[in-house]
């Protein structure tokens, strides 16, 4: 039996306790772990493979302008843990706050696992949670697919 790593959630962001949560994951054979890590950790690459991103310290995502701050960065030989908190400057019903976490993990048999999960709070998060098709779920899958293709 094999156990894979999991996101380490701060208490405020525990999935199911916020207004919106999505999880996307791929496991790909023959992908270079170091390329994936480089293309994810360096935000200047993002627009080359993910159309729903822009700017570095502040970015627009799903129609919201969000400031961002890295909350976790840990790179070891076989795993990258990366997470950031984002928020907008709006008040009341327009306020949105997010915690977006990633794991890139080198697995046996020449496989790489990429896991991304996002937990959100605020009225906009509630609306995103109800969207059909789910814009955040599909957007993050496009991010994963783009990251994989760009890293090949």
Regions found by a protein language model. Give the residues of each.
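Hydrophobic ligand-binding cavity/cleft-lining segments
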Residues: 1-56
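Residue-level detector of alpha-helix boundaries and kinks
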Residues: 21, 30-31, 89, 128-132
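A conserved amphipathic terminal alpha-helix motif
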Residues: 113-115, 119-152
């Amino acid at each position: 039996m094999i156990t894979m790593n999991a996101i380490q959630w701060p208490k405020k962001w525990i999935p199911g306790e916020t207004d919106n949560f999505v999880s996307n994951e791929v496991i790909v054979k023959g992908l270079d772990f170091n390329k994936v890590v480089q293309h994810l950790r360096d935000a200047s690459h993002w627009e080359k493979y993910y159309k729903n991103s822009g700017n570095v310290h502040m970015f627009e995502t799903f129609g919201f302008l969000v400031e961002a701050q890295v909350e976790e960065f840990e790179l070891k030989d076989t795993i990258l843990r990366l997470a950031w908190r984002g928020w907008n400057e709006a008040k009341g019903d327009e306020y949105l706050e997010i915690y977006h976490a990633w794991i890139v993990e080198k697995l046996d048999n020449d496989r790489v696992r990429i896991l991304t999960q996002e937990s959100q709070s605020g009225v906009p998060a509630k609306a995103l949670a109800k969207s059909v098709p789910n814009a955040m779920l599909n957007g993050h899958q496009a991010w994963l697919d783009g990251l994989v293709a760009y890293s090949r």
